[in-house]
C-alpha cells in the first residue's frame, strides 16, 4: 500500500506536516491501529475503491506538505519548485497531469480585463496555495468520510443513527458568537441605564 501512494518507509518524521507533532503514544502500535482501521472499513462495508479514495487523500496531503518552493533565482520573486520530484509523486497519487498542476501552481491563468494572462507567483504565495490545497483536501476528505460512515450507519434511512464531529476551533468561534449576541444588547442598553441613574 505504501508503494501505491509513494510513501516509502521513511516514517512519520519524513513528512513536513507531521514531523513536529507528538506522534508517539506509549503502548500504542501504529501498525496495529492501521490494521484495525482497515478491518473497520471492511466491517462497515466500505468498498475497495472507497478505501483507496480515503487513503489517497491522506497520502496527497502528506505529499503536498513536502513540496518546497523557492525563488527562481537570486533577486527574483518568481517561484519555482525546489524538487519537482515531490510534485510528481503528488500528481501520480492524485492521477493528475504534472505539467498542468505546476503551471496552475506557479503561473496560474487569471483574467486581466478581457484577456487571460499567466500571473507569476512568489514562493510565499505558492506555499500559501499549497497549504490551502492540503487543508481543503483534508477537510473535504474528512467530511466525505463522515458522510460515508453515516450512510453506512443509517440503514433504515430515518437518520436515527449517525456520528457527529465537533470542530473545536469552530466551537470556540460559536462560543464567541453567543457571547457577542448576549453582550450586544447589554452594550447597547448600558449607556441608557447609566444616563437614567444619573
Which residues make up each language-model segment?
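N-terminal switch/interaction subdomains of large nucleotide-dependent motors and GTPases
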Residues: 1-198
Amino acid at each position: 500500500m505504501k508503494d501505491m501512494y509513494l510513501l516509502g518507509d521513511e516514517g512519520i518524521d519524513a513528512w513536513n506536516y507531521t514531523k513536529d507533532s507528538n506522534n508517539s503514544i506509549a503502548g500504542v502500535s501504529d501498525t496495529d491501529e492501521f490494521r484495525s482501521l482497515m478491518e473497520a472499513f471492511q466491517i462497515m462495508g466500505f468498498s475497495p475503491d472507497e478505501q483507496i479514495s480515503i487513503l489517497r487523500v491522506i497520502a496527497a496531503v502528506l505529499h503536498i506538505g513536502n513540496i518546497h518552493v523557492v525563488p527562481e533565482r537570486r533577486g527574483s520573486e518568481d517561484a519555482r519548485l525546489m524538487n519537482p520530484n515531490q510534485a510528481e509523486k503528488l500528481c501520480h497519487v492524485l492521477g493528475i497531469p504534472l505539467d498542468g498542476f505546476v503551471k496552475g501552481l506557479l503561473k496560474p491563468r487569471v483574467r486581466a480585463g478581457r484577456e487571460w494572462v499567466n500571473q507569476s507567483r512568489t514562493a510565499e504565495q505558492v506555499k500559501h496555495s499549497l497549504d490551502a490545497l492540503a487543508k481543503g483536501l483534508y477537510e473535504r476528505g474528512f467530511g466525505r468520510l463522515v458522510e460515508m460512515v453515516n450512510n453506512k450507519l443509517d440503514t433504515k434511512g430515518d437518520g436515527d443513527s449517525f456520528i457527529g464531529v465537533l470542530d473545536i476551533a469552530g466551537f470556540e468561534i460559536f462560543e464567541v458568537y453567543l457571547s457577542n449576541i448576549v453582550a450586544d444588547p447589554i452594550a447597547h442598553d448600558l449607556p441608557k441605564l447609566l444616563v437614567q441613574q444619573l
